Amino acid sequence: MPQNQSDIRRVFLHTGDAYLGVKPTIVSTVLGSCVAISMFSPRKRQGIICHAFLPSRAEIKDVNEPSIQICRYVDTAVDHLLKSMRRLGVRKNELEVKLFGGATGLSYSQVRPSCALGIGNRNVDAALENLEAKGLKPVSMDVGGNVGRKLLFCTYSGDVWIKRLEKHMF
């Protein structure tokens, strides 16, 4: 636990990125149709979070396009988060998982038009399906709707603060 506010690092999480906090960090991000998945170990007091853009790698226009952002896609992000926590010695059954985002809205130029329909809901569904396939269930969720969210994730407590953005801001 940090002694004071100056001991806490602050990081902004971009789309497709993940952040593993082995030291006290406040991770912020802004979500529209994207989803953020956090995993926290109360025993280790360490957490990880990702900002995923699409349900699966198959959603992009050019599936042969190389992507170094493994967390850009929900399906690969869940695997990455679990592997990262496992490397820290965290067992799957001790994880607190949380899920956020999945609002309506997306720039259609970024994906095939048939994939863009309901992308927020599809991101949430993909997250829930991938987590369930790994035997995980979120302890907390704030998903869907038609407004974006600003999110703050505290890596040493697992706490998450959400601010819903006004429609005219999104």
UniProtKB/Swiss-Prot annotation:
Q: What is its EC number?
A: 3.5.1.44
Q: Which UniProt keywords apply?
A: Chemotaxis, Hydrolase
Enzyme class at the top of the EC tree = hydrolase
Known catalysed reaction(s)?
L-glutaminyl-[protein] + H2O = L-glutamyl-[protein] + NH4(+)
> What biological processes does GO assign it?
chemotaxis
Give GO MF terms, alphabetically.
protein-glutamine glutaminase activity
Q: Which SUPFAM superfamilies match?
A: CNF1/YfiH-like putative cysteine hydrolases
The family note in this entry says: Belongs to the CheD family.
Biological function: Probably deamidates glutamine residues to glutamate on methyl-accepting chemotaxis receptors (MCPs), playing an important role in chemotaxis.
Write down what this protein is called. Answer: Probable chemoreceptor glutamine deamidase CheD
Which source organism? Answer: Maridesulfovibrio salexigens (strain ATCC 14822 / DSM 2638 / NCIMB 8403 / VKM B-1763)
